Each structure stands twice: as C-alpha cells, then as structure tokens.
Design a protein with these regions (language model features):
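Alpha-to-beta junction loops
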Residues: 78-88, 99-103, 133-136, 181-188
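Short, polar/charged alpha-helical segment
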Residues: 36-66, 71-72, 95-98, 150-154
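Hydrophobic/proline-rich hinge and linker segments of small-molecule sensing/allosteric domains
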Residues: 105-126
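Flexible hinge/capping segments at coil-to-helix
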Residues: 119-135, 159-161
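Short, well-ordered beta-strand elements
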Residues: 25-39, 60-66, 104, 132-136, ...
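Short helix-initiation/N-cap motifs at beta->coil->alpha
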Residues: 64-75, 88-90, 162-182
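Short, low-complexity disordered leader/linker segments with a strong preference
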Residues: 1-29
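Short coil/turn segments
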Residues: 35-39, 119-123, 139-143
Length: 188
C-alpha cells in the first residue's frame, strides 16, 4: 500500500493511495482529512467550493473529516480512515519516516502559517517572557509543538517536562480562545 503526502513549510496536503479496496462504495470514494481553522484555509476553501467533487465528478463520493492536529490525522491515514489530508510539516515528515517511505512528501501548500499569540494582560512581549507561563498547542508532536520547543530552546527556556518553567498544554483549537479568556493559558 502506497501513501503520499504533499508538504509545505506550515501547512500540507496529504494524499494516500490505497492499493486495494474491499467494496464498490469505498472504491468510489475519497476520504479527506482537514483542520477546521483559518490557518488551513486552502482545505476549507476546497471543501466549501467542492473543488474535489468538481474535479473527480459525480461518480466519486468525497467524505470530509475534521481533525484537531496533524498527529491524529496521520493516525487516521495509517488506519485507512482517510485518503487525503491537509497537515503540517512535522507530522508529514514523521509519517514518512514511520512508514519507511510509503508515505511520500509531494508538495507545499503554504509558508509562515503559524504565529505565537498572547492573551490580553499576560505580560508577554517576547519569548523569554514565557517563563512561568502556560502555552497552548493543539497536540503533542505537531508543528506548533515542535516550533514552540525550538523557540524555547533558542531563548534558553525549557518546558516543565524537561525541568524548565514553561508549561506546555495540549488544548483543542476550538477551545483556545475560551482558555485564554479564562486565563487558563497565557499564549498559544
């Protein structure tokens, strides 16, 4: 079974091609994974404009599934739950390595799609100010997580799990604004 991934700096399209299908319904469908947030606007646009449906025609049923972050989407790809997906570079590279090359990186989709934001009143004006703070990420092992770890390292900081003083907390994308408003997290 061959799996393919389209990759970019911050956002990626994953294309999985299964070698065998068991029934006609599955053979006539494409299962698409995506993130339901603005940082993955290309996939949202494809879904809203029915780009895949228009490209493949009425004989192909396109099924869309939303994911919170890349690692969960890669698991779905490996499980055969999706054929195509839009993910970040770290999960794409991880999938390529884990699959011994069966997942191939094909193409970039965007550049510079991740930023670090702070909640109002958090007293953060730079990375060093994250000391003693809580930072939300969508999922451990995704692009935002590894980008944050690199930012912390470059600033001489470490997460609490490595003996440092920055708490890194996995928070679903849809819950970040409320977590910030409650003061549960200081940055995301």
């Amino acid at each position: 079974m061959k799996k393919l991934i389209l990759t970019g700096i911050m956002l990626l399209m994953v294309l999985g091609v299964s070698g065998c299908r068991n029934n006609n319904d599955e053979a006539n469908s494409i299962k698409v994974g995506y993130f339901n947030n603005v940082t993955h606007a290309q996939a949202l646009l494809m879904k809203s404009e029915k780009s895949l449906e228009n490209t493949f025609g009425k004989d192909i049923n396109v099924k869309w599934t939303a994911f919170n972050a890349g690692p969960a989407e890669v698991e779905a790809l490996f499980a055969g739950d999706i054929d195509i997906g839009y993910i970040g570079p770290v999960p794409a590279i991880s999938a390529n390595v884990k699959s011994n090359g069966d997942v191939q990186i094909l193409s970039g989709a965007a550049k510079g799609g991740a930023i670090l934001i702070r909640r109002e009143g958090a007293q953060i004006s730079g990375v060093k100010d994250l000391a003693g703070k809580t930072v939300a990420i969508p999922q451990i092992g995704n692009t935002q997580h590894l980008s944050l770890l690199k930012l912390l390292e470059d600033s001489g900081l470490k997460p609490v799990t490595e003996g440092g003083n920055v708490t890194v907390s996995a928070v679903a994308n849809a819950d970040v604004a409320n977590a910030m408003a409650r003061g549960d997290v200081d940055a995301a």
